[in-house]
Amino acid sequence: MTTLTRQDLNFGQVVADVLCEFLEVAVHLILYVREVYPVGIFQKRKKYNVPVQMSCHPELNQYIQDTLHCVKPLLEKNDVEKVVVVILDKEHRPVEKFVFEITQPPLLPISSDSLLSHVEQLLRAFILKISVCDAVLDHNPPGCTFTVLVHTREAATRNMEKIQVIKDFPWILADEQDVHMHDPRLIPLKTMTSDILKMQLYVEERAHKSS
């Protein structure tokens, strides 16, 4: 079977485009389903042939877009291990983490079913899982906020410094105390495997959210 490297056909860029589009939809939907923001700021749209809820709040949308704009060059270079949406309580302690573990193969097998043919269908299944995840999660306390964390491979440090200069959107090293949860409950939501991408989504949930 013929194989391509990540550089051929701008493979890394194609995967990064697909992932960033998906992550944008996923973040909006998580914020809606977990009621981080009032339902009134969301509008129903259609993505991946399923209904989703997308924010129409300009500042929130800009933050999400800026974040993913800076993540994209790291995805292109396969420097991202995890993208994590962290929901924080009023004391800025994490109550939930939606963890997207991302693995991209160094070589791409070429076949009639490879590249992007099945990826949209697989991503649709993730969106559907997020839509109903509140059935397996406890209610969050009122007044929650969120942040996005990116776990990178060690080699990504220099790339991130360059991106900060170019994008004018500073990355801040996360304080472990700010993002650590003691003995969280782990809830697997979805796993996908394709020729160009492997991804797993799970939630880490704090045991006692009201304390």
Curated annotation (Swiss-Prot):
Transcription among keywords: yes
Keywords linked to the UniProt accession: Cell cycle, Cell division, Cytoplasm, Cytoskeleton, DNA damage, Mitosis, Nucleus, Transcription, Transcription regulation
GO biological process entries: cell division; DNA damage response, signal transduction resulting in transcription; double-strand break repair; negative regulation of protein catabolic process; negative regulation of ubiquitin protein ligase activity; positive regulation of DNA-templated transcription; positive regulation of peptidyl-serine phosphorylation; regulation of cell growth
UniProt organism field: Bos taurus
Domain of life: Eukaryota
InterPro entries: HORMA_dom (IPR003511), HORMA_dom_sf (IPR036570), Mad2-like (IPR045091)
UniProt name for this protein: Mitotic spindle assembly checkpoint protein MAD2B
Region entry Mediates interaction with REV1 and REV3L and homodimerization, spans: 21-155
Residues covered by the HORMA domain: 13-203
Keyword Nucleus: yes
Protein function: Adapter protein able to interact with different proteins and involved in different biological processes. Mediates the interaction between the error-prone DNA polymerase zeta catalytic subunit REV3L and the inserter polymerase REV1, thereby mediating the second polymerase switching in translesion DNA synthesis. Translesion DNA synthesis releases the replication blockade of replicative polymerases, stalled in presence of DNA lesions. Component of the shieldin complex, which plays an important role in repair of DNA double-stranded breaks (DSBs).
